[in-house]
Amino acid sequence: MVLATNSRCLAYHGPLLYEAKILMSYDPSKRGSKAKVEDGLPPTVEIGNVVNTHKRKRGPRASLPAAGATPDGDDSNDKNRHFSPKEGKPDVPADLADENEDKICYYVHYKGWKNTWDEWVGEERVLALNEDNIKLQKELKAAALAAAKKGKDFDALAPPEALSETASPAPTTKRKSMASKDSPAEGPRPVKRRGGLAALEDLEKEDDYLKRKEIALVVPDKLKAQLVDDWEFVTKDHQLVGLPRKVTVVDILKEFKKEAEAKYRPGSADADILNEVVSGIKLYFDRSLGSILLYRFEREQYLQITQSPDHSNKTMSEVYGAEHLLRLFVSLPGLIAMTNMDAQSVAVLKEHLEDFVRFLSTHQKTYFLKEAYTNASPAYEALSKGL
């Protein structure tokens, strides 16, 4: 029996089961994708949790809800998911693996995960959401915990939003698998999967994490409008930010630090905290760029950059600029929620982060330039679609 589109289910990801939502289903006997997604729905900004529910207007700027807002309380992209066929196979989804074309499959969104983890899975990986299967889900988690306590290698993939280190999802194309050499073009950065006690800690903290509240960063309206423009340039106009940027993330952080440290006595505790915050922003940017800061259309460019000998010794903060750095501040509240910082430390960090956001706003005309975006070539567009 084919499960209904938009219904809830349990789906295997690694050896564990996670609650998921079925966004589309594929039945080879009917040679079609049962996508209950209507065209013409407002576009959804794919970065973090900021959602743009307005179509582009060349008059007044479209507005964004406050950072942290999510559509219908979920981070699924069903409002922005449209059926795209494979070349020469009009009834087969473009991103469905060849080996799955002859079996029932579901395009699922894992509850609480970023939509970059949405994927087609075979029906053998999907279970109905009922009491028996929920019991199985709990038993699998308990078995994983027991294995971790005994020091056995545990290869479970806990939800990516719950881990401080994560493994990347299985690539669906050859080009995506090439990206696994460095940070992937889709999904979190590739690091060694955690086993033993580390995996145990991940699982035990998973429930606690989901209960945490994100901090609310104040983002000026003109930077929210900047995010809307950025999203439209890339996803609607198929433009790319020229790389490497003349003024990089590293350059911007240096300018901010130079301006901010004038308020503090050299060597003071406040000056030390400022240094840590600046270093932390750079670290977060370098580690999260390939996983959560790119639109799909930009991933081929990222792949080319990471494989270029000219940039082999550079971090991403030495290549990318303000456009991608601003996207980080949409996701930072959720990333900070994954840490174990106490309330006082979070309050201090929040103050410095908002100082930096105001700095970006003050220097918007310097760092955010429309001419930084250029039209992608037809060859690039073909590569980005995996043709």
Swiss-Prot record:
One of its GO terms (biological process) is chromatin remodeling. Residues 52-96, 159-197 are annotated as: Disordered. SMART domains: CHROMO. Residues 76-92 have a biased composition (Basic and acidic residues). Residues 100-126 form the Tudor-knot domain. GO terms for cellular component: NuA4 histone acetyltransferase complex; Rpd3S complex. Residues 211-385 form the MRG domain. Involved in deacetylation of histones, chromatin assembly and chromosome segregation. May act as a transcriptional oscillator, directing histone deacetylases to specific chromosomal domains. Component of the NuA4 histone acetyltransferase complex which is involved in transcriptional activation of selected genes principally by acetylation of nucleosomal histone H4 and H2A. The NuA4 complex is also involved in DNA repair. Belongs to the MRG family. Component of the NuA4 histone acetyltransferase complex. This is Chromatin modification-related protein EAF3. It comes from Yarrowia lipolytica (strain CLIB 122 / E 150) (Yeast). The lineage of its organism: Eukaryota, Fungi, Dikarya, Ascomycota, Saccharomycotina.
